[in-house]
Amino acid sequence: NHTNLNYKHLVVTGIGGTLERINGYLEKAKSQKDKEFYTGCRIVMEAVSDYIFRYAKKTAEKAEQTEDPVRRSELGQMAVVMEKIATQKPETFTEAIELVWMIQLIGNLFGGSALSLSRFDQYMFPFYKHDIERGILTVDRAFELICSLYLKLNEPKMRTVQSLAVGGVRCENGENACNDLSKLCLEAMSALKTPYPNMSARVMPGKTQDWFYEEIMRTVKAGCGQPMILNDAVWIPNLTSLGIPEKWARDYYNMGCTEIMIQGKDCNWTTGGLIFFPQLCNALVHMSVAKNKTYENFDAFLNEYLQLVSAQCDEAGESGKNVIHSQRERNCDPFASSLIDGCLENALD
């Protein structure tokens, strides 16, 4: 649930690079527990590679069966791309976005209740810039691919919320991070008006340029209810106040709905601890009526209500801790462990 898929790292290393890291750690593993951990990660990532390769094979078969020359060419190119990314790192924008989609799909198959493409415009921009400068990608084609990705995210196979963040600041130096791809992502949302991705636009007063604010307003005016606007001047200090390094805090994004995570750094989340505040108020009213209890003023009622809320929060917190401890003892997620920073390095699920 809320699996942090760390695309920022994945598009650089690819599936093959991830497997190389796992095998390297496996060769050096000393304890049986560590060997089992790395073996599990290797099995899963090999399965990921095989899964993508099966798509490549099926797409090639469809290409042979297709009479329309344009569609046959498209399917043939898709097959070539997927066969490559099944084992090698992506080198073009088309290859990178295909890898992102396949991993997002696999994340849903693994039971991801809420997933995110995180800071898509940041980790995809080097591929976009490279291809545009060399004339192997047009802006229109990039826009079409982004729109296609958005449409795929809205297919029934996707379990729940799929999110994406654009804009913000660079994690290295805190400078403005908005780029041409940030603009295209917003334009795609304005054109399609789809529920997903649940998009956020990050802004930093004094750093974010006027053109990005204008693009945000254009998207809002399109009537699609997107994007949510996140203020870096608020969120980054909030995160650093929790002890998170500023460089990491600058790399935050909205996971699923509005949950804030750090790209590549957070572990999976559990769903629980839901507190229905109106229901608590209603329960207090019914209890007061049943006991024929009255209050001198509203503040007295509010004080008792807040005590009830506090007790429920404590109970929810303890319940959440029990769930987390139970998961640690009974479950493991080698897929997420292969992608989240620190897991492979420390042989920790």
Walk through the language-model features, giving the residues of each.
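A conserved hydrophobic secondary-structure block that centers on an alpha-helix together
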Residues: 63-70
